[in-house]
């Protein structure tokens, strides 16, 4: 079988034309050079968002916190001053009340000393003098708002009486005060003490 002659390789046989230097690519001076990212420029003479300094919202928040702290400190100072002023006024009122009460009993002491002075000359007069002083002291307590309770024949009242004895008495209904061993003074919230009494019981 006849052999077909091979054709020469055109790519190998064709001469390669040299490419001029710099052809097909931009000059080096036209290549983009890497650099820092561009920042937004200021407009109308105002600093950009990356300018130094806190944001306006942060400034407002800080200012609001400072105002609240100042108000809180002023409120604490006002409360402390109010507490001290109230304590001073309360102590002053107590001192006035103590002075008023003590002054009310000065005449009682004067009459008691007068009765003791005359006791030597007339021993029988001492009883009347002591009774008069007692009545005067009772009147002073009543004027101060503490009336005396020493009644018998009245019904037992737990708000005024304290039972210290129980007896049988056919002439009095049960629960009747038949004897007062110690008078009471005052009523309700202003009670100094209840009266110590003896009451009747059922048979």
From Swiss-Prot:
<dbReference type="GO" id="GO:0042803">
    <property type="term" value="F:protein homodimerization activity"/>
</dbReference>
<dbReference type="InterPro" id="IPR009012">
    <property type="entry name" value="GrpE_head"/>
</dbReference>
<dbReference type="InterPro" id="IPR013805">
    <property type="entry name" value="GrpE_coiled_coil"/>
</dbReference>
<feature type="compositionally biased region" description="Basic and acidic residues">
    <location>
        <begin position="1"/>
        <end position="12"/>
    </location>
</feature>
<dbReference type="GO" id="GO:0051087">
    <property type="term" value="F:protein-folding chaperone binding"/>
</dbReference>
<dbReference type="InterPro" id="IPR000740">
    <property type="entry name" value="GrpE"/>
</dbReference>
<protein>
    <recommendedName>
        <fullName>Protein GrpE 2</fullName>
    </recommendedName>
</protein>
<dbReference type="GO" id="GO:0005737">
    <property type="term" value="C:cytoplasm"/>
</dbReference>
<keyword id="KW-0143">Chaperone</keyword>
<comment type="similarity">
    <text>Belongs to the GrpE family.</text>
</comment>
<comment type="subunit">
    <text>Homodimer.</text>
</comment>
<comment type="function">
    <text>Participates actively in the response to hyperosmotic and heat shock by preventing the aggregation of stress-denatured proteins, in association with DnaK and GrpE. It is the nucleotide exchange factor for DnaK and may function as a thermosensor. Unfolded proteins bind initially to DnaJ; upon interaction with the DnaJ-bound protein, DnaK hydrolyzes its bound ATP, resulting in the formation of a stable complex. GrpE releases ADP from DnaK; ATP binding to DnaK triggers the release of the substrate protein, thus completing the reaction cycle.</text>
</comment>
<keyword id="KW-0346">Stress response</keyword>
<dbReference type="GO" id="GO:0051082">
    <property type="term" value="F:unfolded protein binding"/>
</dbReference>
<feature type="compositionally biased region" description="Low complexity">
    <location>
        <begin position="45"/>
        <end position="56"/>
    </location>
</feature>
<feature type="region of interest" description="Disordered">
    <location>
        <begin position="1"/>
        <end position="64"/>
    </location>
</feature>
<dbReference type="GO" id="GO:0000774">
    <property type="term" value="F:adenyl-nucleotide exchange factor activity"/>
</dbReference>
<dbReference type="Pfam" id="PF01025">
    <property type="entry name" value="GrpE"/>
</dbReference>
<keyword id="KW-0963">Cytoplasm</keyword>
<dbReference type="GO" id="GO:0006457">
    <property type="term" value="P:protein folding"/>
</dbReference>
